[in-house]
């Protein structure tokens, strides 16, 4: 099983991350803005809390972001101590946030310059669907590499559209 890092364990991210753990993946998570109840929920399921992006990115193969807006995703990727500045860049970023397409294009181009692969995979439906693992996930990215993330996406969604 792949080692997963998850950034953003709020209303949608918490159940998505929970489903990943419940399907047997090793999951580490980081979210500086979340309440302790979400942290405790994931810890009780077997998730590992990380205290920085540096710590989160050390031993993961895939990092998922589920953040409120494009500025948050850009900050995680390119801000001070962002993902592009970490020692391990041998991961795939799956941004599942619903953000402006221009932000996604910019983020993808900048990550590519740093040899980091990215998929844009926003979700649709309700919080209950996130809890049930029945989200609609619309994926954009390298088609040949899509097969490497499809099983992971299926832990969170019942309808995966490439």
Where are these regions (language model features)?
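NAD(P)+-binding Rossmann beta1-loop-alpha1 motif at the extreme N-terminus of oxidoreductases
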Residues: 1-66, 91
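Rossmann-fold dinucleotide-binding core
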Residues: 4, 99-162
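A short acidic, helix-capping loop that chelates divalent metal ions and anchors anionic groups
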Residues: 37-38, 73, 128-132
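Rossmann-fold NAD(P) dinucleotide-binding segment
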Residues: 53-118
């Amino acid at each position: 099983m792949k080692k997963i890092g998850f950034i953003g364990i709020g209303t949608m991210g918490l159940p998505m991350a929970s489903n990943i753990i419940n399907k047997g993946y090793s999951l580490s998570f980081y979210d500086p803005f979340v309440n302790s109840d979400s942290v405790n929920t994931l810890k009780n399921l077997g998730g590992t809390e990380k205290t920085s992006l540096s710590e989160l990115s050390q031993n993961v193969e895939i990092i998922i972001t589920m953040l409120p807006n494009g500025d948050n995703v850009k900050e995680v990727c390119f801000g001070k101590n962002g993902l592009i500045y970490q020692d391990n860049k041998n991961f795939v970023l799956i941004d599942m946030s619903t953000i402006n397409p221009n932000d996604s294009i910019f983020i993808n181009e900048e990550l590519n310059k740093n040899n980091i692969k990215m998929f844009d995979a926003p979700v649709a439906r309700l919080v209950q669907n996130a809890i049930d693992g029945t989200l609609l996930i619309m994926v954009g990215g390298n088609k040949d590499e899509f097969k490497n993330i499809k099983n992971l996406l299926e832990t969170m969604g019942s309808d995966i559209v490439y």
